[in-house]
Amino acid sequence: MAETRIVVGHAPFSVGEEYPWLAERDEDGAVVTFTGKVRNHNLGDSVQALTLEHYPGMTEKALAEIVEEARGRWPLGRVTVIHRIGELWPGDEIVFVGVTSAHRSSAFDAGQFIMDYLKTRAPFWKREATPEGDRWVDARDSDKLAAKRW
């Protein structure tokens, strides 16, 4: 039976605490995880903080749809998607994607797919605090191109 966990919230997460749930199914031979962190720079400027906003309810629905689309493309076991919101600092963990499958190629591909679609389809808004002031972060062309490959 396939299982999915989706969490959007302010609380920090622990990669070490997420792994055991992903890894406990004996039918899954691959566990692939990705953890994204807040960088201390963007567009050539120093980033002092990052504030993430979302559309409650709609964001979780969009993430669930992304995971279901991944399940339609690859034979997946468990999937976890965690995305933090609120004010974050350089070095803070912001997103976690964990995917299990019988084989590594499906797990790797599905993990990349979920991240690529999360970056382009999930309703999150980012505001960076820089020494020059706050600014909203636009979607990157590279993220759009990455999503198009699927």
Residue ranges and their predicted role:
Residues M1-I94, A102, S106-Q112, D116-W150:
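N-terminal, polar/charged subdomain of small-to-medium soluble alpha/beta proteins
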